């Protein structure tokens, strides 16, 4: 906050790092599997790690597959993506007990980008073309209804040729525009 030269937070190769809410510890992902390579098992598995801040690294997950995208729920638990049950779903990991449990069980497509709200205990994530939420303590996942107001699909200005029946003609003071009514509709022309 006071400024100065940036310093390296940790020297392990990794990505998707998130600091713990209390500021002591960085959860991150190590591994080189492309996220699009579903079902990979091998040496490049993506696993969750914790850098404690005092130089110690702790491997958090040891699933023979990919664990990815950690997000802190509170100071002692994370949510993350895992394909432990086939498709990628949201799981919760308790750092104190080591317990891992599923928060979602979607079958059709992989879940993407889970993010926990530390204050509200809510996890939001993307599934197909929608945003979903689930309670960090566990609940039935809920698809959010998002209505986005949009512009009209067509231009409201319509060009037509008016024939017989024009009435109520008025010309602008500078003589560049003329307005008139045909069958109860107002028309403006140059």
List each model region and its residues.
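Structural signature of eukaryotic scaffold interfaces centered on beta-propeller domains
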Residues: 20, 115-117, 160-172
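Residue-level detector of Asp-centered blade-edge/turn motifs that repeat once per structural unit
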Residues: 21-22, 73-75, 118-119, 173-174
């Amino acid at each position: 906050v006071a400024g100065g030269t940036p310093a390296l937070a940790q020297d392990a190769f990794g990505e998707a790092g998130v600091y713990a809410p209390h500021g002591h510890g960085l959860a991150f992902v190590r591994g080189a599997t492309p996220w699009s390579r579903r079902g990979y098992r091998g040496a490049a598995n993506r696993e969750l790690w914790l850098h404690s801040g005092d130089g110690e690294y702790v491997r958090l997950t040891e699933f023979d597959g990919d664990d990815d995208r950690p997000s802190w729920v509170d100071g002692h638990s994370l949510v993350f993506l895992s394909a432990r049950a086939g498709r990628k779903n949201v799981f919760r990991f308790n750092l104190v007990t080591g317990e891992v449990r599923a928060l979602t069980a979607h079958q059709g497509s992989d879940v993407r980008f889970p993010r926990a709200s530390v204050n509200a205990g809510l996890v939001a994530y993307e599934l197909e073309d929608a945003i979903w939420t689930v309670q960090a303590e566990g609940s039935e996942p809920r698809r959010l209804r998002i209505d986005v107001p949009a512009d009209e699909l067509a231009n409201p200005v319509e060009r037509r040729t008016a024939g017989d029946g024009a009435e109520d003609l008025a010309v602008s003071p500078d003589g560049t525009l003329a307005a008139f009514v045909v069958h109860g509709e107002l028309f403006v022309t140059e």
